[in-house]
């Protein structure tokens, strides 16, 4: 009888531990914030791109943009669920919406745009994000692949990036 009681207690204890472990697993971010799945960037835009711009002191400097399959400069991109946003964001109280915006300030949405894509805040309040569009440009009389980086509703050109630092310097 005593052995049976110890055995039963042991089984109940291990089942309890197993259930406790299931409950402690972190919830998926996808479900919490309306993420459908990771956004896949167009293949033509992937890689390291270099562009020439002025820094805060006014001197010209080469900047790098790294685009991978699902990220721009290590910022992961996701596709948002419109159903989730309609239910939990657009029709939520101002207080809840502001809390949601604060929680998701480091999550970015990716959208297809022409042959490129657009990156915007998870909940866009103003502006239209940054566009990355593959184009062909002439540098010193030769056609080369470039990345048109643009912002705003226009979209308005911010820079043209190239596959090498040398091309970025030559293009000016």
Predicted regions and their residues:
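Sec-dependent N-terminal signal peptides of Gram-positive bacterial secreted proteins and lipoproteins
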Residues: 1-31
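Mature, Sec-exported extracytoplasmic domains of Gram-positive
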Residues: 29-172
């Amino acid at each position: 009888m005593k052995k049976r009681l110890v055995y039963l207690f042991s089984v109940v204890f291990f089942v309890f531990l197993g259930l406790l472990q299931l409950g402690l697993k972190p919830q998926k971010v996808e479900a919490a914030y309306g993420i459908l799945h990771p956004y896949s960037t167009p293949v033509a835009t992937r890689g390291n791109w270099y562009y020439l711009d002025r820094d805060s002191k006014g001197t010209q400097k080469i900047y790098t943009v790294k685009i991978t399959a699902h990220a721009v400069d290590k910022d992961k991109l996701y596709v948002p669920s419109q159903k989730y946003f309609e239910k939990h964001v657009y029709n939520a109280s101002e207080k809840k919406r502001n809390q949601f915006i604060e929680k998701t300030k480091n999550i970015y949405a990716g959208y297809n745009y022409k042959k490129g894509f657009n990156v915007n805040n998870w909940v866009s309040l103003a502006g239209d994000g940054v566009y990355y569009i593959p184009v062909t440009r002439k540098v010193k009389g030769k056609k080369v692949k470039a990345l048109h980086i643009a912002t705003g509703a226009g979209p308005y050109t911010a820079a043209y990036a190239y596959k090498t630092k040398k091309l970025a310097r030559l293009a000016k």
